[in-house]
Amino acid sequence: MATLPDVNLADLLAEVESDAEVTHVPLCREEEGIGICTGAYLVGKKCAAIMQNGGFFNSCNAIVSTLLQYQIPVLLLVYYAGDIGDRTFSTSGAMTEPVLQALGIRYYILRDPVDAVELIKRAQILAEDARRPVAILLTKEGLGRRSVVPSL
């Protein structure tokens, strides 16, 4: 798994780091993860990139010119900053789904941590069968964190 540290993903990244069955590759920039995942796929490995949606936006050129162009199945686990109930980065939140749609990348939204394992398995199978990236948008609730609820 190729990851970039992020406070919202800290618990997930700690799990990745501690899993002996996972090769963890920390990144400096998210688009590096697209190249690393491509290389892993070309030698027969499954790979996922974990990033925030801002990093996903930064990676769009690499996603289009590599993953989509050469039909590389990579699972994109993207923290959904600015999702409903998350008062940070509202512009990023508003643009995340339209950008995925414009790129033709199928995506699913994880809102309950109970669904995580099954959703990841199914998304990985879809990516492999379609030979395309598939994204899972990780919400605060989906990661088991409380949503920010404003007082009215």
Model-derived regions: residue spans:
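Thiamine diphosphate
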Residues: 1-152
